[in-house]
From Swiss-Prot:
This is Large ribosomal subunit protein bL32. It comes from Borrelia turicatae (strain 91E135). InterPro entries: Ribosomal_bL32, Ribosomal_bL32_bact, Ribosomal_zn-bd. The lineage of its organism: Bacteria, Pseudomonadati, Spirochaetota, Spirochaetia, Spirochaetales. One of its GO terms (biological process) is translation. SUPFAM superfamilies: Zn-binding ribosomal proteins. GO terms for molecular function: structural constituent of ribosome. It comes from the Bacteria. Keywords: Ribonucleoprotein, Ribosomal protein. One of its GO terms (cellular component) is large ribosomal subunit. Belongs to the bacterial ribosomal protein bL32 family. Pfam families: Ribosomal_L32p. Transmembrane segments: none annotated.
Length: 60
């Protein structure tokens, strides 16, 4: 049976476990054109704008 040759250091163990402790990035941000919540880095589904440029023609 395989046995570790050296004891893993605290730094290595904690670095490996730290992936589960990362903070969640907010998935939504306010649209700069209409103020509606929109998914980050995507066109707003309400107005069709992204970064102050219109990308979709929405017939409202």
């Amino acid at each position: 049976m395989a046995v570790p040759k050296f004891k893993p250091s605290k730094s290595r163990s904690r670095t490996r476990r730290s992936i589960n402790m990362r903070k969640k990035i907010p998935q939504f941000q306010e649209c700069s054109n209409c103020g509606n919540l929109a998914v980050r880095h995507r066109v707003c589904v309400k107005c069709g704008y992204y970064r102050n440029s219109q990308y979709l023609e929405l017939g409202l």
